[in-house]
């Protein structure tokens, strides 16, 4: 049985790919690319494609639906684990590419136990998480001194839930803010953070955009590839 590398390719800028990730991609026999539905394409692949122009690796797309139906998802993860293991028979080297870092809301980690069940050797290669890149771009410190940091998704939460998180933590990163913009707006206002947030969308790409104005945010359609950093207003 071959070996699979789970590779974080960073948030969007191809130049933020790590040297180790680059070297593994050069030697990979197969590169596995997650996509939300068949034929939709892979943003992770768009990040690496210029780095593998001379590669002879086989590119395999794997479908990962963007919903939360547990049983259906588990079947898909198991099937993708089987597909990956089949491709790596005969001591082949594979690379499963994923946005940001594999340990942060990554399709790879959901699939990992199902790949291991087939006896495939696995190594995880870290990448730059989107919220770290966003903090750098916006020059926003994520933590200082004894402050804490919470990273949490927005998933059709009630405004009360989000407000509670903002009141309990010094620094908050909300992933997937497009999931419930209205609840997010309410929570920002109720926690008094209208002047201490930054929305960063499509970080590291040509479409990158930063929004720090609450009124502008109210009128803006937040795309899926976005995140928000919120600081304590007293800081």
For each of these PLM feature ranges, what is it?
Residues 103-168, 233-234:
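Class I SAM-dependent methyltransferase SAM-binding "motif I" and its flanking Rossmann-like core
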Residues 4, 166-235:
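A contiguous loop/helix-start segment that scaffolds small-molecule binding in enzyme catalytic cores
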Residues 65-70, 131, 157-159, 205-207:
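A short acidic, often aromatic-flanked loop/helix-cap motif at beta-alpha or helix-coil junctions
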Residues 38-41, 129-132, 181-182, 205-207:
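Short gly/pro/ser/thr-enriched loop/turn and capping motifs at secondary-structure boundaries
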């Amino acid at each position: 049985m071959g070996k699979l590398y789970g590779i974080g390719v960073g948030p969007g800028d191809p130049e933020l790919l790590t040297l180790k990730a680059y070297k593994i991609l050069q030697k990979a026999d197969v590169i596995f690319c997650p996509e939300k539905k068949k034929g939709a394409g892979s943003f992770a692949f768009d990040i690496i494609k210029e780095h593998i122009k001379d590669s002879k690796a086989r590119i395999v797309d794997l479908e990962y639906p963007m919903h939360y139906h547990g049983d259906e998802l588990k079947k898909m993860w198991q099937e993708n684990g089987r597909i990956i293991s089949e491709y790596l028979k005969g001591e082949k080297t594979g690379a499963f590419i994923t946005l940001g870092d594999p340990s942060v809301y990554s399709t790879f980690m959901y699939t990992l136990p199902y790949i291991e069940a087939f006896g495939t050797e696995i190594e995880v290669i870290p990448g730059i998480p989107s919220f770290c890149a966003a903090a750098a771009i916006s020059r926003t410190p994520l933590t200082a001194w004894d402050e804490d940091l919470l990273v949490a998704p927005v998933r059709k939460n009630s405004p009360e839930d989000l407000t509670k998180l903002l009141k309990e933590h010094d620094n908050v990163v909300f992933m997937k803010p497009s999931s419930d913009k209205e609840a997010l707006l309410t929570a920002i206002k109720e926690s008094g953070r209208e002047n201490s947030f930054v929305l960063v969308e499509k970080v590291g790409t040509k479409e990158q955009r930063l929004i720090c104005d609450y009124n502008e945010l109210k009128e803006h359609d937040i795309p899926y590839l976005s995140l928000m950093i919120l600081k304590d207003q007293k800081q």
